[in-house]
């Protein structure tokens, strides 16, 4: 069995607003009891290269409702029936060109018609049927997808509430728009992330998030207590890359060797909302040959949190969070090596203070004037 962990104590990056992801505030409509106002959250994450094209990631949060039943006769004075909320839901519209007018985006949501169905293969799945989307998003990824199939636990808050024999519709309430550089849009193929080999060592990344919640809340029971008393701490892991095993028997492949590799990569971590809450990692230095497939040509990679921890990702739909710390961990890649070796931890992962919070750029995303009732 592995012995105790070897940790390299290094200073934590200075505190900054850029380490935070803010939750949407709850603003109720004055008319219509219990109705939330539609809102937009706007964020910019740029690579720093002026030649890099800008795009927008549009991510939506809302609620699944049963489709209203229609009667035989309908008059013009009939009011549209609003069915009760069944559960919360997230759906990404993907990447597309830069969008400008926030109020236009909110009004365009009335043109959305997305049906929801439950199915199963080896596990439960959700099928989104895209019947109609606003013309404003015609150049975004969702316009090319008539059907979107996904694991139910990643996109639906409480999939157990969806039952057979009921038609469901997805109603968008919150719109998260991230203006970013095109070079940031890179994810590692799942087969590469899942592959393990005795010929390499695996580099994992642990990000500690301070989640905004009350100590006596239900979600706090599944997290660690924050020693600073400012919320709860959640740990999420990603497979970052692989490093080739050194074969020089005269060299010590210890924490100093690993720290040197990480230091040369100059790793920086930030958080954004792209495919839902997403951790972004940038390698600004030398990337070893074995690690290059895990980054794009400009050293960026995105890791959606719902791929690693669906339950934590769903918590972040409605709760703010802050990056407390990030570490890289060197492990054996294959399970036999993993069980026999210690974890070597490198804690000097920078938090990008310009790309880890959600601030309004030139307008306030939380004004009521930029909101409409979620009809």
From Swiss-Prot:
Keyword tRNA processing attributed: no
Coiled coil (residue ranges): none
Keyword Lyase among UniProt keywords: no
Role, per record: The M protein has a crucial role in virus assembly and interacts with the RNP complex as well as with the viral membrane.
UniProt-listed InterPro entries: Matrix_C (IPR042539), Matrix_N (IPR042540), Matrix_Paramyxo_C (IPR055413), Matrix_Paramyxo_N (IPR000982)
Chief site of localization: virion
Family of the protein in this entry: Belongs to the morbillivirus/respirovirus/rubulavirus M protein family.
Protein name: Matrix protein
Pfam families: Matrix_Paramyxo_C, Matrix_Paramyxo_N
Top-level division of the source organism's lineage: Viruses
Gene3D superfamilies, per the entry: Viral matrix protein, C-terminal domain, Viral matrix protein, N-terminal domain
GO molecular function, one term: structural constituent of virion
CC annotations in GO: viral envelope
GO terms, biological process: virion assembly
Compartments where found: Virion
Swiss-Prot/TrEMBL keywords: Viral envelope protein, Viral matrix protein, Virion
């Amino acid at each position: 069995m592995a012995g105790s962990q070897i940790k390299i104590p290094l200073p934590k990056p200075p505190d900054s607003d850029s380490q935070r992801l803010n939750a949407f505030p709850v603003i109720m409509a004055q008319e219509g009891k219990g109705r939330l106002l539609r809102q937009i959250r706007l964020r910019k994450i740029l690579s720093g290269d002026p030649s890099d094209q800008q795009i927008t990631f549009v991510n939506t949060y809302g609620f699944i409702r049963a489709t209203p039943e229609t009667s035989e006769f309908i008059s013009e004075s009939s009011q549209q029936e609003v069915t009760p909320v069944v559960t919360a839901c997230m759906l990404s519209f993907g990447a597309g060109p830069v969008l400008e007018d926030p109020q236009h985006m909110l009004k365009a949501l009335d043109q959305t018609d997305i049906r929801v169905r439950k199915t199963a293969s080896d596990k439960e799945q959700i099928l989104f049927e895209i019947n109609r989307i606003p013309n404003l998003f015609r150049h975004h990824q969702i316009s090319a997808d008539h059907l979107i199939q996904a694991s139910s636990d990643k996109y639906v808050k409480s999939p157990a509430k969806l039952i057979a024999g009921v038609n469901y519709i997805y109603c968008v309430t919150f719109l998260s728009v991230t203006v970013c550089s095109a070079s940031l849009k890179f994810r590692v193929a799942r087969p590469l992330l899942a592959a393990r080999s005795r010929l390499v060592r695996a580099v994992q990344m642990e990000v500690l998030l301070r989640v905004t919640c009350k100590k006596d809340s239900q979600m706090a029971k599944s997290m660690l207590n924050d020693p600073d008393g400012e919320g709860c701490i959640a740990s999420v892991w990603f497979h970052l890359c692989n490093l080739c095993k050194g074969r020089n028997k005269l060299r010590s492949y210890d924490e100093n060797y690993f720290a040197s590799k990480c230091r040369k990569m100059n790793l920086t971590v930030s958080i954004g909302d792209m495919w839902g809450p997403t951790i972004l990692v940038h390698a600004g230095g030398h990337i070893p040959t074995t690690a290059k497939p895990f980054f794009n040509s400009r050293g960026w990679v995105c890791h959606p949190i719902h791929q690693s921890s669906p339950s934590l990702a769903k918590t972040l739909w409605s709760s703010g969070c802050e990056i407390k710390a990030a570490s890289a961990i060197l492990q054996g890649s294959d399970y036999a090596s993993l069980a026999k070796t210690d974890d070597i931890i490198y804690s000097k992962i920078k938090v990008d203070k310009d790309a880890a919070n959600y601030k309004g750029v030139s307008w306030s995303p939380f004004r009521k004037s930029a909101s409409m009732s979620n009809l």
